[in-house]
Every structure is written in C-alpha cells, then in structure tokens.
Amino acid sequence: MNIKELAKKLGLSITTVSRALGGYSDVSEKTRERVKKYANKYQYSPNPYASTLASGKVKTVGYVLPIYGTNTSTLNQGNFFQFISGMSEELLSESIQLQILFAKSEKEELKAYEKLITEHKIEIIVLQNIKTNDKRIDILNNYKINYVAWGKTKDKRNYSWVDLDNEYAIEVIINYLIKKNHTHISYINISEKYNFANERKSSFLKNLKANKINFNPNYYASVKLEEPENSFEVIKKMLTKNKKISAIICSTEFSALSAIKACNYLNYKIGKDISIITFDGALVRDLSSPPITAVSFPVKELGKRAINILLNKNKNKNQPINYLAKTEIIERGSVHIVS
C-alpha cells in the first residue's frame, strides 16, 4: 500500500496522513492515533521521499531526455516515453514530481545533469543510455546524488540499475534463427560506446561460436547513434556484397526500418528471400508485409522498477539494487525457414 491509497481509506489528505505519521502537533492526537492504527493494519511503511510531504517539501526526480541522433525519431522516442510512463505512474502514487530537461547533444546532456543538481536542487535522478564508461555517473557520485540507471557500465560499478538482459536476448535470437536453419546471420548494432551494444555484440560472437558458426566481420556493422541515416547505406552495401546473408538482426527499430528499405530497394522479399528480426518492434511491425518479428521487453516495467528502487534504497541501507528484465520473441512472419 502507498500513502495515496492509505489517505483514501482514511478520507484524509496525503499531507495530513504524512504529518500524522511524522508526529506533527498540528494534527490532533486522535487523528494521529487513527492514522497509525490504519498504517499498522495495512502494513504501510512510509518511504523516505514521500515522507518529506510532512514538512511541506515535495521531492522531485530529475530526468534528462536526449533529443539528438536516433532520438529525434518517434521510432526511438517510443521507448523513452514508455519508460517515463512507468516512472510517472509510480511517482504519482507517492505524490512525487518528475522534472524533465531536454538535451540536443551529448555535451548539452552533461550540462543538463549539472543544471538539475546545481540550479534545480534535484537530489534524485534517473539516468538512461548508459555508456561503457559513463562520465555522468562520476558527476552524480561527486555530488553524492541518489540515482538509478537504466542500463549499466562495463565495470558494473557499485550503483543501482535496471536493464534488459542483453546477453540472454541475443542468445534467444540466435537459437531462434538457427532452429530455422539460418547460419549466415548479420547484425546491425549501434556504437559500442553504449554498454548495451557491447553486451549484445559480445553475446552475438559467443553464441555464434557456441553453435559452431564462424563469425564473418562483413556480416557485422555498428551505426553511430548520432548518425542514424547512415544505416540504410550500410545495410544496402552489406547485402549487396554478401549474397549469402539470410537473416538480419537489428539492435534498434531505426535500423530495422533501414533494413526494410534496403530489402525493398534490392527487391528482396522479407520473410521469403531474407529474414529480419528487431529489438522492440512495436513501431515498425506494420511497415512491411509480413510484419516484423521482434524481441519484446517490458520498458514500462523498467520505469516502474527504477522508481521502486529509488524509493526503497534507504530500507536496504543504501545497498545497490539491480533488476534484469527477460525478453520474449513475438513472431510476426518476417523470419523464414531456410530450406
């Protein structure tokens, strides 16, 4: 139970309930006792952030939304907004505010975090798009800011994070393709400066080897997140020079869109001449016939988990809390069986 639900049961405002639990004298003793009785009955334990309502100060969670590179496209913004939706639901239930700043470049993004801390006095922050070595984590640690990350650095330092199990996801994809007799598998990744891209590449190589498939470097490409328009040319050239490729794995929906365009340009029939499977896929699924098969994961749930971790860290003596989400393949017809 959260404070909003408790207040509703009591027929009181959230502030009154919070101040009653805090023992404030401006709330009558009778009301304080009644609130405590109900709190015990429903095993409600106020979290350290919602309880600041008692002093009239509402905590705010800070979030920086990048709007450069592929993130200028609705194909990639969808994930961010699902994540924000999950965060918002949890924050709303605790009457905690969310402040979002936008950044048009990587440099501007770093400044935005500094601004949240120094100008807006934000003490709780959620990070995303974690890099292999991420300067933002050093900034937040230096300011002693409470934060949780959507993603993890290569060294998986001592901080809380939520993430997709990227290595497992690639394993699932490779096994799925091999069951359909694919051995000439290409992978369109993004820049390995992002740690999830590193994890996916590592798993790609590992699982090819585990299935006795030699890695062909001509079947692999990484596209800069800041230059998404290049992916069409990259995929077109790859398919033109490597006629044996039977399946394309796309790390983002933007590269999936480029793969669809490249296949159409080369007159390849998706689901017959060549297969495409992408991460996410909700926004590109109907942009080809047949629709694109995808690896789905619960982005909204990751947003909820991130906030739950922030709200419960003090109960765990500030020990880092981590959560890995599993994936599932949603078949839509774009992956064929190789005869």
Per-segment meaning from a language model:
Residues 109-121, 231-243:
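Short, well-structured alpha-helical segments in soluble
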